[in-house]
Each structure stands twice: as C-alpha cells, then as structure tokens.
Amino acid sequence: MENRDTILEENRSYWSGRAAGYSAVNRWELSTAQRQKWKDCLREELVRQFPARAMDALRVLEVGTGPGFFAILLCELGCDVTALDLTPAMLAEAKKNAGELAGKICWMEMNAEALTFADASFDAVVSRNLTWNLPHPDAAYAEWARVLRPGGLLLNFDANWYAYLFDEKAQAAYEQDRRNSAEQGVRDQNLESEGEHFDVMEDIARRVPLSQLRRPAWDLARLHALGLHARADERIWQRVWSEEERLNFASTPMFLIIARKGQC
C-alpha cells in the first residue's frame, strides 16, 4: 500500500498552488447571499446544541480553513475561533480575506489528522470540503472527537467528490452535470476552479480512501465507533448552495454530518 504520508505532502503542494484561485471562490461567497445562508446555518446548529450559551462563550475549531470562509463567519457570530490549515499559503489568503477580523482569529498551521491541542479543548469542531481529501480520515475523526469537550458538537460539510472515478453511474451523472452547465451558460466550477491542476487533483483523489466509499454511511459508522451520537442531513445542499452550485454539482449533493459527544 502506498505511504499516505506521500499523499499528505502532495496535498500540501497542490493546495499551496490553488490558494489564490480557491481564495477567489471564497471571496465570491463572502460577497453574495451565500454569506448569510451559511452564517444562518452555522448559527442554527450551534444554538440547537448550546441553547443556554452565548456565542462568545463558545470555543470553536475550524479544521481545514482554507481561505477562511467559515472562520470569518464564526467570528462574525461572536465565537472564539481557532482556524487551522495544512498550508501557509491558504492561511495567508485567509488572513487577507478576514480583514479587520483577522486579529480576532487564532490561525494555525497544522495537520488535520494530528492535532496538537489538549483533550477536550473545544465546544465545537467544524469543517467543509476537507474529509474527502484526507489520507487518514479515520485518524482525523478520532482527533476531532478527542479535542471536543463533553457535550461538544462536530459539524462536517462534505460530499462524495470524485466518486465518478470509481463508479460508472456516477461518471455518467458527472458528465451530465458538465453538459447541463454548458447548456445553461453557467461557468463550470468543477473544471474552471481547478484549471490546469485538474489532472493532479484527480490523481490524488484516486489514492485517498474516501473517493470510493459510500458516504455519509462511512462517516456515521466511524463516528458511532468513536462513541459519538451522529446523524446526517443529506439535504443541506438545498439550504446553502447557490443555483449555480446546484447545477454544477447536481450529481454530488453536499451532506452535513452532525455529531455530538456524550449526549443524545
């Protein structure tokens, strides 16, 4: 079996090269109605789990912050935010995007699969579009559970990205998404955002474990094994995606993993 530490370094290199382009996507989100949609979603989940707690009393960790989208929204909500990423280039973009809020967020370069925090350090751990790309997602979930306080909340937004590399039906649906985007005159986010890096990402996706596993079933099984109470909202995309995203990624709907530590 391939040494997945090699994949980790390839990820670091790939996302360093994608930092500027991915940051542009996040800035677009911050400048549109997507900003409020996502902020409302995060607020609702936090309030549901912590109805008696003020936002400024919640210590929240964002894993894989990228250009800082979630970190910025959580800071605007008033949370005490720590945001980590594997790549310094992404953290640099995140700080720029955060503007005046940058100084209120603790930015850290760190591996999502090997956190350096003490046990029970955070009330909530959040992540978006990260888990699928990890060489050791089982280790990542174990770490995220470890740093959660009793009664803590894990929110993980992800999708079956690159499942089309292993499934003929998924491949056909993916190709239909490309045709639909072209026919509707909508920019193809899947191809445009990655540009010349597309083949590199597909190569990595072929070698990480989650591209060929059924999700969110795998995630729920793993979290239950860790002792967390977990469920999946497989319609979250209907709430947070733009019309353009719905067209681009129709065959790969986003899901939300909601897991709680130590309580039902």
Give, region by region, the residue ranges found by the protein language model:
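Conserved class I S-adenosyl-L-methionine
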Residues: 1-55, 70-73, 153-192, 198, 202
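Class I SAM-dependent methyltransferase SAM/SAH-binding core
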Residues: 61-63, 67-114
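A short acidic, Gly/Pro-enriched loop at the edge of an enzyme's catalytic core
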Residues: 113-124
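A short SAM/SAH-binding and catalytic strip from SAM-dependent methyltransferases
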Residues: 124-137
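A short glycine-rich, Lys/Arg-flanked "PGG" loop and its adjoining helix->strand segment in the class I
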Residues: 138-150
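Short alpha-helix
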Residues: 209-227, 232-233
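Core SAM-dependent methyltransferase catalytic element
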Residues: 243-264
